[in-house]
Amino acid sequence: MSSRTNVVGIDFGNSKTVIAVARNRAIDVIVNEVSNRSTPSLVSYGERSRFLGEAAKSAEASNFRNTVGSLKRLAGRTYDDPEIKDIESNFISAKLTEVDGFVGAKVQYLNEETAFSNIQLIAAYFTKIKAIAEAELIGSVSDVVISIPAWFTDIQRRALLEAANIAGLNPLRLMNDNAAAALTYGITKTDLPEPESPRRVAIVDFGHSNYSVSIVEFSRGQFHIKSTVCDRNLGSRNMDKALIDYFAAEFKEKYKIDVLSNPKATFRLATAVERLKKVLSANANAPLNVEMIMNDIDASSFIKRSDFEELIKPLLERLTPPIEKALELAGIKKEDLYSIEMVGGCTRVPIVKEVIANYFGKGLSFTLNQDEAVARGCALSCAILSPVFRVREFHVHDVTTYPITFSWEPIPENPEEDSSLEVFSEGNPIPSTKILTFYRKAPFKLLAAYSKEAQLPGSIKQNIAQYLINDVVPNKDGDLSIVKIKVRLDLHGILVVEQAYIVEEQEVEEPVETSPEEEAEKKTDEPVKMRKVKKLVKVADLSVSVQEDRLPTEVLEKYREAEHQMIATDKLVAETVDRKNALEEYIYDTRAKLDDIYAPFTNEEESSKFKEMLTKAEDWLYEEGEDTTKAVYTAKLEDLMRVGGPIRQRYLDAEEAKRQKVQAEREAAKAATKSEAEKQKPSGKFEEGTGGRAPPPPPAEEVAPENEEVETMEIDEQKE
């Protein structure tokens, strides 16, 4: 398959990631190397290589200090961000540190202490996601759409883009996860109303670390996000934390151990709690057992679902305020909603469903796949954006979460001039372009910033970027030039100054508009009437210098080179392990066959020498050959195969001779059967009076009943 036909959607989750692909007129979810439909969002660093995804999950228990999760929560953040220090550090077992001005993780990699930035960590994980997709599609993957939380800021979105680019991916769009779920819902509906009376739907997404509510209006061929409200730090991991603290307090009293003071014990308890919570979703109570939690103690306990629900009551109280706010921003009442669509793994918790259903006063809808709806929406979006896919037309109208204001210094010629303007308001469509007009005679600066600092996550800076508009000069009369600046919120939700230029008012000629009657009366050879009008005409492009709080190009290039080197190292280690396993398998397999199927094809002396050779290779493999290079394992295997190859070939030749003999016997039997069947057929000879056809079989002879007279008739047959 050509790489250009591979369109992939990635739901980059906090605990796991789902990959979907558009193919064969459908959206399929891709399974990973262990046939799971989702891949743990983990990267782990070892003595010889990295472990990514499922491999990182397997290594986590013994290597948790060098394993990093909650990857997307680190994107674009600084080390001193209070949400990093006070919240994320509780969910990440690796040591967090500052790397190139942003938060990263310090781990032991290749037996050395190494620090990786959040961009490097995410890029490492994306290389695994890319490899999973390519293995399934049997071709390269580049164009993707990646989901992000709607509350991600400009710098967080840029960090994710940079990580994806380092991993060799080309994101066509960073898509807000609520919009992706809405696309999955809407594009399959054939009964959507006209735009005049849209269908209003609430999409409630309750995932591992984030809770969001969107009010969406669906109509034929499109949807509009009317509002999105998030609780950035509410998710299933908060429920896990409540259970961990509960059982840790119980074990402190019951076993006199302080689980929370021991990272390994805390990890073991967290693993057990995750299993327990799943049991509680389907049962009224659940046991908890943790073997060797610490100090050689096997800890056990028990909890009722009702006690669990009481334990997380403070979390449940946070479910309705975002719903109320979303309805308020959308300007509708809950009674106006057609349905409430539930997305995210945490929506399986019975008490969560109960609280939300009670607020709306109606049943909840689970028509969307809670785990896969966002990934499917991303794949659909990628197909829509791809020039090689034909998808039913469906327009996505997403909105920005944070308003953006531009500010500038007033000029001496106009000191009363406004010095700021909110260019993109809250709920402004994405993508969106605005043109700002200034009157200047010299270069000037523009500052883009979020309008409301209190809305931003953690210590994300309010300022987005500063733009220096260069090359501005007075107009030909020595007066102020008219400067136009085109600013855009692109498909990723990232702010871009696309163009700056000077315009002048010039007198130009344009055709005079005529009525249809005048057009009909006009003679063919009559010249077109023109009139002179004054219009703004672009006369010069201006260069724009940008100052952003982002990593320099040379640092990103260093990350790219480091990632390529680590990919090569991972590949070499994997191939070395493969050769070692192949050698081990050959030793055991061949030795068993020498006493079995290979026995008739070797003599005692040859067999004895070869067995001795295999035993020596086995001893070497578990001693000095325990840790060596790919080339050495390959050479050892080739040495053994040179001796064992002739024996194996004699066996294969004999098997082939048997096969041919059986085949010949079958063909002979088949031929004999066919010959016998031919003999049983009618002769097929033509006879006179039959019109060139074989004569029909003779009629059955009738036997007259007793005492019945039989009349014999003779027919003279007329020949042709």
From Swiss-Prot:
InterPro entries: ATPase_NBD, Heat_shock_70_CS, HSP70_C_sf, HSP70_peptide-bd_sf, Hsp_70_fam. GO terms for molecular function: adenyl-nucleotide exchange factor activity; ATP binding; ATP hydrolysis activity; ATP-dependent protein folding chaperone. One of its GO terms (biological process) is protein refolding. Residues 658-690 have a biased composition (Basic and acidic residues). Keywords: ATP-binding, Cytoplasm, Nucleotide-binding, Phosphoprotein, Stress response. Its main location: cytoplasm. It is found in: Cytoplasm. One of its GO terms (cellular component) is nucleus. Residues 703-720 have a biased composition (Acidic residues). It comes from the Eukaryota. Induction: Increases a few-fold upon upshift to 42 degrees Celsius. It holds the Pfam family HSP70. The modification Phosphothreonine is found at T39. Belongs to the heat shock protein 70 family. This is Heat shock protein homolog pss1.
